Design a protein with these regions (language model features):
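N-terminal secretory signal peptides that target proteins for export/translocation
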Residues: 1-12
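Bacterial N-terminal signal peptides
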Residues: 15-27
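Flexible, processing/modification-adjacent segments and terminal tails
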Residues: 34-44, 48-52, 107-177, 182, ...
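N-terminal mature ectodomain segment of secretory-pathway/periplasmic proteins
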Residues: 35-115, 149-151
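Gly/Pro-enriched, hydrophobic low-complexity segments
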Residues: 36-37, 159-254
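Solvent-exposed coil/turn segments that connect beta secondary-structure elements
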Residues: 63, 85, 93-95, 105-108, ...
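Subset-of-secretome marker
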Residues: 72-77, 87, 121, 126-132, ...
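Gram-negative outer-membrane assembly/targeting C-terminal domains
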Residues: 253-291
């Protein structure tokens, strides 16, 4: 009888240990299966969290890294102007390049070295979309046009931290998706996957880092761009001014097009790139990426 009680006690003890182990493991992985807030509601909380500024003036440095990983990057000074919820202008000025990009109420134009570029939008310009478009419904519509289905949401982890994933079921990273900090609802990762017929190496990942609060508005002080896991460019913000006043002409696309002629076709641009040194080629490649 004593032996039976002893074995029963041992059995129950082992069963309890196994139960506790299973419970702990379940808790560790629960975030990926727990209840998830609806994507549109997450975007609403995100835009509310970023603040209520009416406009922003941002001074920053854009660093373009050489793809060979052996040479130092090219640094360019940029000035950004945000007028919420849907007007934006960036001015890139240096001895090598002069670039203006304007987005105003759904229309866009890019001027490079005094000439209007063939194309007015590209994915390197899109990083500002998450910071610009408000309210959440407007941002949801803009993300949808870029392949992010915000009606799909899940919980995941990135570098050990829990996060909301919009546009995919974690851990799937093959579709366009936006990641937000689970506690603050601030975005920190945007994966822009390439088209199915293109190589995955062409997918672009943008990371929003070092968020800082300016009065009642949050802004990332560092933004990184990765292709195939390689850092190809980064943005370092020096200053952010809240609610500055801007002339409406700065965002007048029709007015800008009247000031600058149409640039040469792409074929002519390729011909012009011959016999350039490495620094010039880097700048020309930068211009080409933004056309």
């Amino acid at each position: 009888m004593k032996y039976s009680r002893f074995f029963l006690h041992q059995y129950l003890k082992k069963s309890l240990v196994i139960f506790l182990i299973v419970a702990i493991v379940t808790c560790l992985y629960a975030p990926t299966n727990a209840y998830v807030l609806p994507g549109p509601y997450i975007l609403k909380l995100m835009t509310q969290n970023l603040g209520k500024a009416k406009s922003l003036l941002v001074s920053q440095t854009l660093v373009i890294h050489d793809d060979t990983l052996q040479k130092s990057g090219v640094e360019l000074s940029e000035t950004l102007r945000y007028v919420f919820p849907e007007m934006f202008r960036s001015d890139t000025l240096s001895e090598q390049v002069n670039r203006i990009h304007v987005l105003s109420k759904g229309k866009a134009v890019t001027v490079i070295d005094g000439k209007v570029a063939d194309e007015s939008d590209n994915r390197y310009d899109r990083y500002k979309n998450i910071l610009l478009f408000k309210p959440g419904k407007m941002l949801q519509d803009k993300l949808s046009l870029l392949g992010v289905d915000a009606t799909v949401s899940s919980l995941g982890r990135f570098q050990g931290k829990p996060a909301y994933v919009l546009g995919a079921q974690y851990p799937d990273e093959t579709t366009p998706q936006v990641w937000l900090d689970k506690d603050t609802f601030r975005p920190f990762r945007w994966i822009m996957t390439s088209k199915p017929e293109q190589s995955r190496e062409n997918s672009l990942e943008v990371r929003y880092l070092e968020w800082q609060k300016f009065r009642n508005t949050w802004y990332p002080m560092r933004i990184e761009f990765f292709m195939a896991g390689i850092l190809v460019r980064e943005i370092h913000v020096q200053n952010v001014k809240i609610n500055p006043s801007f002339s409406k002409k700065l965002f007048d696309i029709k007015h800008l097009k009247s000031l600058y002629p149409q640039g040469p076709p792409a074929e002519q641009e390729q011909e012009n790139k011959k016999d350039l040194n490495e620094v010039q080629k880097t700048i020309e490649d930068f211009k080409k990426l933004y056309e």
